Amino acid sequence: MPHNNYLYQTRDIKFQIKEWLDINKILSLDAYKDYYGADDFDAICDVNFKICRDVICPANKESDEIGMKHVGGNEKAVISPDVFKTVYNTVIEAGMGPQFGDRQVEGRMPLYWYAPILEMQTGASPAMVMLWCLTQGATTVLQYNLSKELQERFLPKMYSGEWGGSMCLTEPGAGSEVGAVSTKCFPTDTPGLWKVKGQKCFITTGDWDGVDNIIHLVLAKDPDAKPGTAGISCLVVPKFWVNEDGSMGAWNDVTTTGIEHKLGIHGSATCSLAFGENDNCYGWMIGDGPVDGRGQGMAQMFQMMNEERINTGIFSLGAFGAAYYAALEYSKARVQSKKSTDPKGPSVRIIEHEDVRRMLLLQKSVMEACRALLYSSYYYIDMSKEAATEEEREYAEDMFMIQNPLCKAYVSDMAWVMCAEAIQVHGGYGFMEEYAPASLARDCKIYTLWEGTNFIQSQDFTGRKFTMKKGEPFKKWLAEIGDFIANKKTPEFAAEFAMMEKAFAAFNSIIDMNAAWTTTNKQLKQLFATRIMHAAARVICGKLMLDQGLLAAGKLAELGDSHFDANFYKGKLASVKFYVMNVVPEIFGTEEAMKAADTSAIDCPEEAIM
């Protein structure tokens, strides 16, 4: 059956949130200091775990096998099994849903605590988490760009979960090329109110019957706007009109024309939407309307996109983390074949075989490395919004912006690979839908595709992120890695630091070649963008893992081998060593390939690619 047995573990989550990242620094900020202590995270994490184990994960079978159904009509065009509403309402009532989007309310939780909550929820059901997560992202745009009056009209019921939210960018003829959108908006006699007409597709949770209304953020163009992305505006378009007092009015001519039949995440409705088929669809312009043909839509939408990109990394981590824990449990139970060191002995559990150990340590170490990258990046988001000084906020914002493409693309690329490793651990049974990794692999593939394909992330990283603010933030990010490698060496990790020194030198060589190609060979720059992005992720993850290793080594020395937590720290040391000595060295292959500068992929005639 599809994944519906919750095996997720929280010990490394708590280690990274409470022991590794400076939780006291976050909790000393004005937004949090009167409301939370470090131990509160344990309670929140444990409540979320129980919801995931007892409510969300058991419903994943129906999510995968039944999913959403399109029945048409203007009221409830997309219906779901009753258990979906139970899951949704449980999450909302526990405060583990779109409430995190409200960054102005007193007593709000630290934002970086949202990362593990979302990870664990995705590990329970990659599809069902979409029911509330997209709403939280939509509220980010609205609370920072709408007038106070319109915020009061829309946001309370979005935060409460009564209404959902969606992001409407993609059209049949405008996918990655967002500037090609054809949806139009036309001014009316009411200031700020525009008529909307057009079609959108691939809209996650664009409709479903668990909420009373869907508030769509729609990219559209004034017919007189400039071509491309410069002319795009963003409008808030409710499925049902929202009156001045916040009550729900008449249908707003937003039609769900169908839902997609997908490889995975069947429990998430991916909708096709038509706006204004009856010439009666209206929306409020977010911010100002186009000025001299230039809209504000892309800048506004990127506030949500940046958040959804790191969240895609979190989704990816949760999905392949669940696959890893399933593989780990299976490997401890499945008896098959004799040990290589005892060929005449009895058959043993497969966890005792060397190659299974390799696959498990690969999954464990990549999971923990990706978690470090994601949690540290969420920590930067928190600091960028809540730190006391402008200097601290700007630094944190810069570091997050540099790492965000890695959070989205590297982690989602690894999710597909690690789910395949989890399948492999299961042997032939891994190919059967009765075992969890099969559905998790189907579910996780979307993460490399949405919120900007991973090649787009690599272009962003090797282009804008290298050069933003005249390249100073990237230089600082790079210098911090170099300083750590140079100054944190210990005898216990001598081999690992030596490996990181070589890898860091190789990465600097990669950066130099990328910079040269910017002016001399733009096609080579494109050919290697994904590999450069992966190299950067391995460098920063190697640094973060070694930092955790230093902490774990100290803890283990302090506690001793007989302590109940000793095995956790021993496992952490093994993860650190495995990642640095087995995953980081893939950088060298990228460096050598770039030196060779092979252009066969470009030079081969299209007719010869057969």
From Swiss-Prot:
Keywords: Cytoplasm, FAD, Fatty acid metabolism, Flavoprotein, Lipid metabolism, Oxidoreductase
SUPFAM superfamilies, alphabetized: Acyl-CoA dehydrogenase C-terminal domain-like, Acyl-CoA dehydrogenase NM domain-like
Active site annotation, chain numbering: 451
Top-level class of the enzyme under EC nomenclature: oxidoreductase
Any GO BP: butyrate metabolic process
Necessary cofactors: FAD
GO MF assignments: short-chain fatty acyl-CoA dehydrogenase activity
Pfam families registered for this protein in UniProt: Acyl-CoA_dh_1, Acyl-CoA_dh_C, Acyl-CoA_dh_M
Pathway assigned in UniProt: Lipid metabolism; butanoate metabolism
Cellular component, GO annotation: cytoplasm
Compartment annotation: Cytoplasm
Domain of life: Bacteria
InterPro entries named in the record: Acyl-CoA_dh-like_C_dom, Acyl-CoA_Oxase/DH_mid-dom, AcylCo_DH-like_C, AcylCo_DH/oxidase_C, AcylCoA_DH/oxidase_NM_dom_sf, Diverse_Acyl-CoA_DH
Catalytic reaction equation(s): butanoyl-CoA + oxidized [electron-transfer flavoprotein] + H(+) = (2E)-butenoyl-CoA + reduced [electron-transfer flavoprotein]; a short-chain 2,3-saturated fatty acyl-CoA + oxidized [electron-transfer flavoprotein] + H(+) = a short-chain (2E)-enoyl-CoA + reduced [electron-transfer flavoprotein]
EC number: 1.3.8.1
Gene induction: Expressed during syntrophic growth with butyrate (at protein level). Seems to be constitutively expressed.
Function: Involved in syntrophic growth of S.wolfei with butyrate, as part of the butyrate oxidation pathway. Catalyzes the oxidation of butanoyl-CoA to crotonyl-CoA. Probably passes the electrons released by this reaction on to electron-transfer flavoproteins (EtfAB) to finally generate hydrogen and/or formate.
Annotated family: Belongs to the acyl-CoA dehydrogenase family.
Protein name: Butyryl-CoA dehydrogenase Swol_2052
Organism for this UniProt entry: Syntrophomonas wolfei subsp. wolfei (strain DSM 2245B / Goettingen)
